[in-house]
């Protein structure tokens, strides 16, 4: 009941279409900040041991900390859980043209409370026109790459595949494992790896590619999470957590 209430409140607090706003504090309890002292990116907590993020966020395990329950990156609010990363599993091959996804295993389990909750995996695929919420700490201004201090949110419509293909960069390949969201006056141009897209209370996208704030008329591309449930469960089964564990970085392909 607590999780459902938090999810409902979180999506209800999303910004009006086309406008970036600060998320209501702690309204996205699944949002994770991954950082290694040099760079940071977003991810989604899906289990007390596991985070899913983009390939671009495949940081080195032994140097990376996952911060859960955060809102303002510059202030310790007392809600944060800072947990070392134990293992990083990259879905390969990357952009070949199939996948851009990484799973991160925590060295210690997350402690669920009102500020830290997992987001449910997708039980269906998103539909064109469906309105979703995207959140992340990335910059929303051109040529500014420093992370925002506070978590930002925007609501975006899912775009049909053909419209997305028509705006897709020639140097990337279109794949059925992608989903696009955004339009000319509402796009996710956050320069934040692993920004999270939630539709109807379910994890439907992790940012794969966007055109940046210089070109917001084109939709952003996300990994289509509804097609990755089998892979996610395979990774979790093959890499069982331990209360005390060594750290490593691993690359694994999908078992077909």
From Swiss-Prot:
Keywords: Disulfide bond, Serine protease homolog, Signal. CDD domains: Tryp_SPc. It comes from the Eukaryota. Gene3D superfamilies: Trypsin-like serine proteases. One of its GO terms (cellular component) is secretory granule. GO terms for molecular function: serine-type endopeptidase activity. Belongs to the peptidase S1 family. This is Trypsinogen-like protein 3. It comes from Pseudopleuronectes americanus (Winter flounder). The lineage of its organism: Eukaryota, Metazoa, Chordata, Craniata, Vertebrata. The gene is trp3.
